[in-house]
């Protein structure tokens, strides 16, 4: 009874804190409150509080249930939210350079935890005895590595998606302006009055706009470089976790079912996901390939992760259907 109450309290505290953090962060984006009262630093500290609350929640559930809390979808979602808070803390304690990981980790943590604690999963929060197939020491190794891999790959993929948005936003208006300018010059090619006006206008506005344009383009370039920097490193870390998780799962499957690989739906999609991110890392090793190409591959990987993570749970089929929606 005490453990249930403590788990309930920690769940609501962590969700409330991360909700406040997300609100503060969006306020800093809109009105730049961080320069006034330091709200931005407060939001980072809020994520740290959330991390300790979720850690306490997982330990409480571990002690109460007697097994590592990764036996159903609810527990895996809480663990996934915990992994996002870890990534946020790494970016928080890295004071050498400014990064924008908190724009990804804070919303991801609140959405995942909000879904886990919503009414959709109202039957899952109750801890249950493990089915015989899950009563193994490999549970902690395999599932924790897979969830950590999912968290890191999702975060890195979201950074790549942000890179694509900023890049295409940069290319689009530039292309439009070039075409409009070309049409204007062709139509007014022999209008010396218009040409004189353009020259005069450019000479007046040049000094006013050059500093602003340079600083804006430089900031955008720096932002794209930071997104690519963090995306590559976080995806690399997630790829390692995913690889270890797949290998440990193969060993566990051999002990349980007598075969290392059965082409189960979960195994198949995990292999497809692993292949996509292997292609991403291979592209990153080629310096002649633009960053936008690798970002597109990572964006595809983002969709595959959710298919791999939720696909079996939605269908409730295969050897990995424990804790699925339909099983409840």
UniProtKB/Swiss-Prot annotation:
Keyword Cytoplasm attached: no
The keyword Ligase is annotated on this UniProt entry: no
Protein name: Cytochrome c biogenesis protein CcsA
Pfam family, one: Cytochrom_C_asm
The protein's assembly and partners: May interact with Ccs1.
Subcellular location: Plastid, Chloroplast thylakoid membrane
Organism whose genome encodes this protein: Capsella bursa-pastoris (Shepherd's purse)
Transmembrane segments: 13-33, 46-66, 73-93, 101-121, 146-166, 234-254, 263-283, 295-315
BP term (GO), one: cytochrome complex assembly
GO MF annotations, alphabetized: heme binding
Record membrane topology: Multi-pass membrane protein
Disulfide bonds: none
Keyword terms, alphabetized: Chloroplast, Cytochrome c-type biogenesis, Membrane, Plastid, Thylakoid, Transmembrane, Transmembrane helix
